[in-house]
Amino acid sequence: MSWLEKLLDKKNIINTRKASIPEGVWTKCPSCDQVLYRIALKENLEVCPKCQHHLRMSARHRLDGFLDKGERIELASEYEPKDLLNFKDKKRYKERLALSQKSTGEKDALVVMKGELLGLPIVACAFEFSFMAGSMGSVVGARFVDAVDTAIEENCGLVCFSACGGARMQESLMALMQMAKTSAALERLSNARLPYISVLTDQTFGGVSASLAMLGDINIGEPEARIGFAGRRVIEQTVREKLPDGFQQSEFLLEHGALDMIVQRHDMRERIGGLIAKLTNTSIRLEVK
């Protein structure tokens, strides 16, 4: 055997394998392109430490970071969506529901919990945007109404974090009816003289922005959140005009009176707790930072 054959002999070849990185360990900030460690980003409430861009949060992660640690009770979790119209577009509605339920672990796009905020009893709900773009169907409407009714029964404030693409087209008129249903429920909350704080996050559009998201006693936006009814492209095609840059961002809406304030995610607990305390004439438990 020649020296070359010996060199190429399989026994003399050392196999090297590239180290594989598990999927989901790293992510990239969509604003500054900074590569971020996923666990550290989650601990920082999905806020980029470099540019302070607010990334999307899951509903449960948001409520977990917002409510006090301790006992929390999930409300209306027994409601499950049904395909009453046997709707089909590129996929059957049942298939879309099954895929969203599997990927998110949620039954539908709204999570409601009862707990405390800085020692104050509160009902809080959050949209899960990853579930069919957070679209509002009959289950979302029913859960929101239950949240309102519980707040009235418990004589406490209600907070809602919106992240939604609009009414769920697969449920047709039943989805559109939720706009009136949720608005009527909020009228009962107002008559009970209980506060409703609406937090609009990126992105909040369609039937939710035209109903429950904009009906807060105080409407709060997260920084650079996109908020509107129709999308920019649809509006420009309709009015045949070029629209100003950032006209659907929270900063533009604050400047033009559509929002009351913009609050950083890390300040949300203290700011909302203080607002509810003032509106209900109660005191809060101050946190030591």
From Swiss-Prot:
Residues 25-289 form the CoA carboxyltransferase N-terminal domain. Its EC number is 2.1.3.15. Keywords: ATP-binding, Cytoplasm, Fatty acid biosynthesis, Fatty acid metabolism, Lipid biosynthesis, Lipid metabolism, Metal-binding, Nucleotide-binding, Transferase, Zinc, Zinc-finger. The keyword Nucleotide-binding applies. A zinc finger (C4-type) spans 29-51. GO terms for cellular component: acetate CoA-transferase complex. Pathway: Lipid metabolism; malonyl-CoA biosynthesis; malonyl-CoA from acetyl-CoA: step 1/1. It catalyses: N(6)-carboxybiotinyl-L-lysyl-[protein] + acetyl-CoA = N(6)-biotinyl-L-lysyl-[protein] + malonyl-CoA. Zn(2+) binds at residues 29, 32, 48, 51. Coiled coil: none annotated. Its main location: cytoplasm. Its cofactor is Zn(2+). It is found in: Cytoplasm. GO terms for molecular function: acetyl-CoA carboxylase activity; ATP binding; carboxyl- or carbamoyltransferase activity; zinc ion binding. Binds 1 zinc ion per subunit. GO terms for biological process: fatty acid biosynthetic process; malonyl-CoA biosynthetic process. The keyword Lipid biosynthesis applies. NCBIfam families: accD (TIGR00515). Belongs to the AccD/PCCB family. Component of the acetyl coenzyme A carboxylase (ACC) complex. Biotin carboxylase (BC) catalyzes the carboxylation of biotin on its carrier protein (BCCP) and then the CO(2) group is transferred by the transcarboxylase to acetyl-CoA to form malonyl-CoA. Acetyl-CoA carboxylase is a heterohexamer composed of biotin carboxyl carrier protein (AccB), biotin carboxylase (AccC) and two subunits each of ACCase subunit alpha (AccA) and ACCase subunit beta (AccD). This is Acetyl-coenzyme A carboxylase carboxyl transferase subunit beta 2.
